[in-house]
Amino acid sequence: MKELNRREFLTLTGAAVVALSLAGCGGPSTPPAPPAAPTGKEAELVAALNKVWKKKFDAGQVTHEQLTLNQEAQGAIKIQGGIFEDAKEPVHTLTTEDMQKLVGIQEWKTSLEKKYELGGAAGISEPTGEGAISLTFEYSCEDAEVQKFVDKIMGYSLSRKAEFISIYCPVVQGKTYMIATVFWNKKA
């Protein structure tokens, strides 16, 4: 796989935006496939997240007492996690092929935004100047780690309105990681 420098990364990102714009002008697109049923790890993680979320609710920091597992956004975070699974490394420099996969996230986002407002996410770093990204949270249901994970999600201020969470737990080099995003129903 070819590694991209910053200029190639930005050029490819711009090209992806243009391609998405042009695709929106064409015929009907195929809707994303429905997400898979949650695993035991995902269910355990939601329970641990909700313990922390409840404390935030009691302190008046969030709108809803708990997050409901809703895997409608899992397809998007699974695309991201799949890049690491395919590369078999928790720190990865994005390639042209990876960027093509990431274009699929926009389809999910467009579909979700018809019903939901999107909040924060946690589990994957922002790209560095060299286009490197990393999985940032190894799977854990321990209070301290879950608190850090929730704090990352809450980094986006509107996440306080979240009702739902989608989770994906990629396994890379024998370690399980956690990726999540939160969202809530659009008000009419």
Predicted features, each with a name:
Residues 99-188:
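A well-ordered secondary-structure block
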Residues 16, 80, 84, 153-157:
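Alpha-helix boundary/capping residues
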Residues 1-20:
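N-terminal secretory signal peptides and thylakoid transit peptides that target proteins
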